[in-house]
């Protein structure tokens, strides 16, 4: 049964938080990230470079710290490991999540990279709509990023997402020239949220490294790059903020 009149607006944020280390002052201040995210009032948050057990970061468990401070459900997968500690991708959600999956995007000997997927159960009227979200962090080399996105769009997890199912893909694509969307994501019917916007470095953004893309029964209502005082200093990237209308049809 369809419910054409029912819809729900959700806010999605994507942000490489640089392990809670400021991009200009080099200060480790998790509270700045928490305060910034709280001000955004997002329903779904895609974070990259979330650290655990790193001595130079007081050995903090940023996964627990952030999720508890914001009162959100969380899913996490470690990516890059050090001798002591590691960091990875995290999805925070105000709504319950299920079907947490990981796609390995590591290419050869290069740094471990991946995509974290979750099904978020968004309330729409008296019903729940499954919104499939993917959080990516791609590599630094151009050829590496191309292979990673080719693997991602061809992976089984994505193939099983129906064309009408709300699908959101976001993260740090390290997209220096803004070319990855047109080459790999738009052919899969994934539209960029908003226009191409610079997000790095945070103090004076010159490169459009980050992006949010979407398809299915979801409509973009608003898009912006975080420009508050905290958004400019809390990390070395600026956050992306997108409001979507999710419908049952």
Regions found by a protein language model. Give the residues of each.
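Active-site neighborhood of divalent metal-dependent phosphoester/pyrophosphate hydrolases
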Residues: 22, 48-56
